[in-house]
Structures are given as structure tokens and as C-alpha cells.
Amino acid sequence: AAEMYFGSLENRKILVIGATGKIGQIMMKNIAADHHVQLYAASRQLKSGEKAVLGTDTLSDGHGTRHQQTEEYVQIAYADRYRLANEMDVIISATASPHYTLTKEGWQSGVIQKRRRILIDMAVPMDIEAGIEDEENSLCHLDELTSLSEKNQHLRFEAADRAREMLERDT
């Protein structure tokens, strides 16, 4: 969703709220592995300003050479999430919290910099309160992502069918 919104995530600043949880960790690893971004993690367990290592993976380049890839991110305290939101291009919230991690009131008082950004809510129940979205801020919920995924899967199946038909015609 964020790539569709911006076209590319290269050099974007991305904040993951709930980064120490299961979904948050998966999101962090996937983002770090696929994109050259500045990654930030907010959680109630994290302290601000510390750099941390997401993990080290051994990668093969297909020619027998193996490389170590270490992904770093900056930890921020949960209480600093609105202040840091001013600098972010993408904010992903993936917590098991029963309350909102981003509220309309907190957003209006803490996020003063107007800029184009996308907020992605991966939680059930929702983490991000409706009403934050406006001309600059787009809000995408888990149900929208599911629908988008299903559409993309359908398009891939159609493309595979067309390719299969072309191969059958040519053989």
C-alpha cells in the first residue's frame, strides 16, 4: 500500500508502532529486507534514540558468495510517537492494544508538520482513530489491505493464464 502511494519506498522514513510484537517484527524484517529506508520502531518497551539491530541474515548472491546483511533501526519511546510522526513518510501500527495508538486529538496537537504520508493500521481492533486522514494523510486499514491483496492475486492468476495460453499456442 505504501509503495502504491509513493511509487517507491527508497529513502523514506518509516515508523512501526508495536515493533516488539509478532506482526510488528514481521513488518520490520520485511521492510528492512526489501527496501533502503530509514526504519524507526516504537514500543512501550523501547527507549528513545538507541540504534538496534533487527537481525543478521546470511544471503547468497547466486554465485556461491554469501553475504551478511544486518538491518539497523532507531528505537523510539512510545510516548514520542506523535513528535516523530512529523518526520515520517509511512506510519504502521501493529499492536494488540485495546485502545488507539494514534488518536485524532493526539494527532492534531502533536503532528504539526504538513506532509504527504500514509498510515497503515494492521491491528484488530483498529489502532488508528478515524479522522486523522485528510488531504496529506491517507489511512489504510487491514480490511483494505486484504482486499488489495485479493485483487493483486486475481491479477497474477489472470497473467499466469495468459502466459500459459501463449505457451500452448507456440508449442
List PLM regions with ranges.
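Short acidic low-complexity segments
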Residues: 67, 71-88
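NAD(P)-binding Rossmann-fold cofactor-contacting core
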Residues: 25, 34-59, 64
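Glycine-rich adenosine-cofactor-binding loop
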Residues: 2-32
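Cofactor-binding loop segments of dinucleotide-utilizing enzymes, especially the Rossmann-like FAD-
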Residues: 19, 44, 122
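Rossmann-like NAD(P)-binding element
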Residues: 81-104, 112, 116-120, 124-125
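Adenosine-phosphate binding glycine-rich loop
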Residues: 108-118, 122-171
